[in-house]
């Protein structure tokens, strides 16, 4: 079996295709967005490979696995078990970190449990149990002839007169003791003060160091250890200031007796009570009510709403503030910013133990007076948040919560014991906070000796291999402690790719979805090397990809097309790259051979130095106090290697600031910055990302772009509708009236099958048409509402040609290249690139003010060369209306057509975070330090 044979694949828009795919090769599936690549790779090959594997398990085991639908295909032969690595499923678990996903943290736990050296947190002394012979050897290694004495500590820093203890020691035959640092005779001990802390150490032996002492010393040490319960001290008799030797036979600190249980891997897990920090339960952050969120606008007064919910309109809380104002003599009508720091403290944190006279008035106007301390706004919110059972109250209060690093563990997630175990003077949190590249250097140079080297050998190999795979997929800038929630789709996918290589499976079919997303051209070669490595192990690697380098590196290319949606679903060309380039119908072939290409603009829009948006002092994550200057009215690209700080600068700093100031949103805090100027040039900010346009099957392009409302109004205006008294609501499948009630307007009915995937069957009342019979009797230009929803955008544009409002909105959907999707197509079936273009179309169809700031993060994800051309046309159109466009992008075709480029770098992670160069593409291409410049220069020729 050296090939996979597919016969009669009809999944989604595939048109009954037959294919022969070579096994154990690197196969790239390419084609326009929406042409059917994912339908072939994921919904046919992967789904069937996965289903066959799961079918072999028992019915009991199957119910725990999410089964995929059986693809609509006649026959597939030669499949192996399949593993898919997609972008979608990043973990939302706050306990997941890069270290735990890649299993590096598990190996680190093992390493620290087996070769770690525990130390006392207070005295930094290694906790090591010593044998008597080790103690004797240590003493004998001192200079010969040195006068020493051996002491047994009996009492450490305890109050009391201790007369009984001293009498007992004398009766046991001991002659001297050192009491509070002074050696004295036990026959006449000093009188000790009752209220002072004392330390008593018995003198067991006094000697001069010489070689034949070992027998006598061994006996003395045994006596001392028995008397003191495991500790002994050796002091210099001639020099009181000399450092004393401390010995312990217990696994404990010889100074304070701090001891630890035996080291085991779970002690180093922040997901296990044994190792988690008790304050934050191993999350590394604490939630708190943030005064900056509670006081949204310090220029307002308390009466005017400085604290939401405590102003004049909320009678109960406001009368408390008035009583407080009387007591502390401040004015509730004065702006919050003008009140003293003490008043701020009392209002937010309470009056402590000080009683305040509160006047309460009830609904009938009766006043009662009570005296009690004021708990403070923040404490009041915290208490209500903990006590309430209403989810609405909790959601309302959650808006005022921020996270800060846990004070006890300083964000390391581990308890005190785990933080004080060292491998070569480095504790576990220090390794977790290293970037992956730095950690790799650390383990390469780690030299353990003797038995510890043997124990750690295998563990270190596993850690080293996994770090190397992460570096090879371009993730050397991530830290192991980075939370999985904060990873981008491309990063999460490449981490899973690295863990798969770490698993070293053979004979598997891997299906990957655009692994090059979010990856700079520089890191692309390493990623392709990784894919080739997977193939060389003996696996079939199928990649859905548009990247030119990936297509050139493939053993076998499958080009799906010729168009998208209903116009696609056929194999236009397949075989090695030369064969693809020889097929004139293949768009991919034409772009690869250079017959078609995305042109560099003849002239660029010049920047106006008077109109700029200037953000100064951005310091989030790895940004090094940068100043970003964006020309207004231009198409700007933000570039730089992965992890250089592009998303932090734009998505975490610029976008939240603009959203708060322009859109009045009360969303997440922007990353730290000093100042922003130039926002007055804009009236709103819009982020166009690839998140789904709706999460339910009821959401569709028609409802999202606002086409559906005028369509329903047209149907309601038909004479037949008016005579029946139908309103536009009659033609909605979301409300009662016109929809089919058997399936509630879904058109399908979900049947839950245990052990098998849920099946959706067409509703037998409306036959999948979503409306009842009466509604479907109304026709507009000979079509029912169901038939209109079933039209593609192209057909609908022609059909509604005479209705300008509709024609304009549909035209914008065509402008962004979505000719093939259906008006009523469920939002859940759209790809990320399609969802993004539906959003773009909605923006284009609005009557623009020409003062919008658009932010796009990697809009070329999932787009073919021809789709990118269309996207660029749309973005240039938005720019020509006067809008400002900021795009984070790695795709050189987009970068070379930009008016302005801001390049961050030079490296990722701690090696990045600076703006290297900003200017036109021609200026940037000349920058020596920039990695982007190196790849951009040849494109501009």
UniProtKB/Swiss-Prot annotation:
Cellular component, GO annotation: cytoplasm; excinuclease repair complex
Compartments it resides in: Cytoplasm
Keyword ATP-binding attributed: yes
Residue ranges of domain ABC transporter in the record: 310-587, 607-937
One term of GO molecular function: zinc ion binding
A Pfam cross-reference name: ABC_tran
UniProt keyword terms in alphabetical order: ATP-binding, Cytoplasm, DNA damage, DNA excision, DNA repair, DNA-binding, Excision nuclease, Metal-binding, Nucleotide-binding, Repeat, SOS response, Zinc, Zinc-finger
BP terms from Gene Ontology: nucleotide-excision repair; SOS response
Functional summary from the UniProt entry: The UvrABC repair system catalyzes the recognition and processing of DNA lesions. UvrA is an ATPase and a DNA-binding protein. A damage recognition complex composed of 2 UvrA and 2 UvrB subunits scans DNA for abnormalities. When the presence of a lesion has been verified by UvrB, the UvrA molecules dissociate.
Miscellaneous comment text of the record: Binds about 2 zinc atoms/molecule.
Family assignment from sequence similarity: Belongs to the ABC transporter superfamily. UvrA family.
PANTHER family: UVRABC SYSTEM PROTEIN A
Binding partners and assembly: Forms a heterotetramer with UvrB during the search for lesions.
Descriptive protein name: UvrABC system protein A
């Amino acid at each position: 079996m050296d090939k996979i044979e597919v016969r009669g694949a009809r999944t989604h828009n595939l048109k009954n295709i037959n294919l022969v795919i070579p096994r154990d090769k690197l196969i790239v599936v390419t084609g326009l967005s929406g042409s059917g690549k994912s339908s072939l790779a994921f919904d046919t090959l992967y789904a069937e490979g996965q289903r066959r594997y799961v079918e072999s398990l028992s019915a009991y085991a199957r119910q725990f696995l999410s089964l995929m639908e059986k693809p609509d295909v006649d026959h597939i032969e030669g499949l192996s078990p399949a593993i898919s690595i997609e972008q979608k499923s990043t973990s939302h678990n706050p306990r997941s970190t890069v270290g735990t996903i890649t299993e590096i943290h598990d190996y680190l736990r093992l390493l620290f449990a087996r070769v770690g050296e525990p130390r006392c947190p207070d005295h930094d002394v290694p906790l090591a149990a010593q044998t008597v012979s080790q103690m004797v050897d240590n003493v004998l290694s001192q200079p010969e002839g040195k006068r020493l004495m051996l002491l047994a500590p009996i009492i450490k820093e305890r109050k009391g007169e201790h007369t009984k203890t001293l009498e007992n020691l004398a009766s046991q035959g001991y002659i001297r003791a050192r009491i509070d640092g002074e050696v004295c005779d036990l026959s006449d001990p000093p009188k000790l003060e009752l209220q002072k802390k004392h330390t008593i150490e018995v003198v067991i032996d006094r000697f001069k160091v010489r070689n034949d002492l070992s027998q006598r010393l061994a006996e003395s040490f045994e006596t001392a250890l028995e008397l003191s319960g495991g500790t002994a001290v050796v002091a210099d008799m001639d020099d009181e200031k000399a450092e004393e030797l401390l010995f312990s036979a217990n696994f404990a600190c010889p100074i304070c007796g701090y001891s630890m249980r035996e080291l085991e891997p779970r002690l180093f897990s922040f997901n296990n009570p044994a190792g988690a920090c008790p304050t934050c339960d191993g999350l590394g952050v604490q939630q708190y009510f943030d005064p900056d969120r509670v006081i949204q606008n310090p220029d307002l007064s308390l009466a005017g709403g400085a604290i939401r919910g405590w102003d004049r309109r909320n009678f109960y809380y406001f009368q408390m503030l008035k009583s407080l104002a009387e007591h502390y003599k401040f004015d509730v009508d004065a702006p919050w910013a003008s009140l003293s720091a003490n008043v701020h403290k009392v209002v937010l944190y309470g009056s402590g133990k000080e009683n305040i006279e509160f006047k309460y008035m009830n609904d009938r106007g009766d006043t009662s007076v009570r005296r009690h301390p004021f708990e403070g706004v923040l404490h009041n919110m915290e208490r209500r948040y903990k006590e309430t059972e209403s989810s609405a109250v909790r959601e309302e209060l959650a808006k005022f919560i921020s996270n800060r690093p846990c004070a006890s563990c300083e964000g390391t997630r581990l308890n005190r014991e785990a933080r004080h175990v060292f491998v070569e003077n480095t504790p576990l949190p220090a390794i977790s906070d290293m970037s992956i590249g730095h950690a790799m250097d650390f383990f390469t140079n780690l030299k353990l000796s003797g038995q510890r080297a043997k124990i750690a050998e295998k563990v270190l190999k596993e850690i080293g291999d996994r770090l190397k795979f992460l570096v090879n997929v371009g993730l050397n800038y991530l830290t192991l402690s980075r939370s999985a929630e904060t990873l981008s789709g491309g990063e999460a996918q490449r981490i899973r790719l690295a863990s798969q290589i770490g698993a070293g499976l053979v004979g598997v079919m891997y299906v990957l979805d655009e692994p090059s997303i979010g990856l700079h051209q520089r890191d692309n070669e390493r990623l392709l090397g990784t894919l080739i490595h997977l193939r060389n192990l003996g696996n079939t690697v199928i990649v859905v990809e548009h990247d030119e380098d990936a297509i050139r590196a493939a053993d076998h290319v499958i080009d799906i097309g010729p168009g998208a949606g209903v116009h696609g679903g056929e194999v236009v060309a397949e075989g090695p790259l030369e064969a693809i380039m020889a097929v004139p119908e293949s768009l991919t072939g034409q772009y690869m051979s250079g017959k078609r290409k995305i042109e560099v603009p003849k002239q660029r829009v010049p920047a106006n130095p008077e109109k700029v948006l200037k953000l100064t002092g951005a310091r989030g994550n790895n940004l090094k106090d940068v100043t970003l200057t964006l020309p207004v009215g231009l198409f700007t690209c933000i570039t730089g290697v992965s992890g250089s700080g592009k998303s932090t600068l734009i998505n975490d700093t610029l976008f939240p600031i603009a959203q708060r100031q322009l859109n009045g949103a009360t969303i997440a805090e922007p990353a730290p910055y000093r100042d922003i100027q130039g926002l007055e040039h804009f009236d709103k900010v819009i982020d166009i990302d690839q998140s789904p346009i709706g999460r339910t099957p009821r959401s569709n392009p028609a409802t999202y772009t606002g086409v559906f409302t005028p369509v329903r109004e047209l149907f309601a205006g038909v004479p037949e509708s008016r005579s029946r008294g139908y309103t536009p609501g009659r033609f909605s499948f979301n409300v009662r009236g016109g929809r089919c009630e058997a399936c509630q307007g879904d058109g399908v009915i979900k049947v839950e099958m245990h052990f098998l995937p849920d099946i959706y069957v067409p509703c037998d009342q409306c036959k999948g048409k979503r409306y009842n019979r009466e509604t479907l009797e109304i026709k507009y230009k000979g079509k029912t509402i169901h038939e209109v929803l079933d039209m593609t955008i192209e057909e609908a544009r022609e059909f509604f040609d005479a209705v300008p409002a509709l024609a304009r909105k549909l035209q914008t959907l065509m402008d962004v290249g979505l000719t093939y999707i259906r008006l009523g197509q469920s939002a859940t079936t759209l790809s990320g690139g399609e969802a993004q273009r539906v959003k773009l179309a909605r923006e284009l169809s609005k009557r623009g003010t020409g003062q919008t700031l658009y932010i796009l993060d990697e809009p070329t994800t999932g787009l073919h060369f021809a789709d990118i051309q269309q996207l660029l046309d749309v973005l240039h159109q938005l720019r020509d209306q006067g809008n400002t466009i900021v795009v984070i992008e790695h795709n050189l075709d987009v970068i070379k057509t930009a008016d302005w480029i801001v390049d961050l770098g030079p490296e990722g992670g701690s090696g990045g975070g600076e703006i290297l160069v900003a200017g036109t593409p021609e200026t940037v291409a000349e920058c020596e330090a920039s990695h982007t410049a190196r790849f951009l220069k040849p494109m501009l020729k």
